[in-house]
């Protein structure tokens, strides 16, 4: 089962890298392409001699939602449905999980060799939250402002990949802090 989960996770990461690279190419009229998939990071990308790297992570509303999603997507894995209960403050739950997920990545020193070789990379956060709406970023900013982070300087920017009605939207997340 671990092999199936890993295969599913790699497909998910590859999808998010492709979605991100396609959008960056469109926005900036660039020609980035994936050179390698060392894992970690998920991809080494290059455009006209400029090389960078991409790390992908996922942020879900809560652990139960993540477990249900992964078990549903992974062939042969026993389904683990979310409990049938009222979810109070889903935006706040998602925002807290998002802040914890991003904090963990920003504080991870093991990305240092990639930063040193290619410069700061891109952190792509796959938003696994079906209720994401216009108020969600406000909750995310509040949760982020309340989070203490020892940023290792490994990422130049953070992008969100958010599911929309007819596809996905790539959003630059501006996470400026008052204390920075």
Regions inferred by a protein language model and the residue ranges of each:
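Beta-strand-connecting loop/turn residues
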Residues: 41, 49-50, 166
């Amino acid at each position: 089962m671990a092999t199936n989960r890993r295969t599913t996770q790699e497909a998910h990461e590859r999808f998010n890298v492709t979605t991100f690279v396609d959008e960056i190419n469109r926005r900036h009229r660039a020609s980035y392409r994936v050179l390698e998939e060392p894992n970690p990071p998920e991809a080494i990308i290059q455009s006209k001699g400029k090389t960078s790297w991409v790390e992908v992570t996922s942020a879900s509303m809560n652990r139960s939602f993540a477990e249900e999603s992964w078990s549903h997507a992974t062939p042969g894995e026993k389904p683990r449905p979310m409990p049938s209960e009222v979810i109070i403050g889903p935006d706040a739950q998602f925002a807290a999980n998002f802040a914890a997920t991003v904090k963990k990545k920003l504080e991870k020193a093991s990305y240092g060799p990639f930063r040193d070789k290619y410069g700061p990379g891109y952190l792509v956060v796959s938003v696994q939250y079906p209720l994401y709406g216009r108020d969600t970023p406000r909750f995310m900013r509040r949760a982020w402002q309340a989070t203490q982070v020892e940023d290792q300087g490994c990422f130049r920017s953070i992008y969100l990949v958010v599911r929309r009605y007819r596809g996905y939207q790539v959003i630059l997340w501006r996470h400026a802090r008052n204390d920075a």
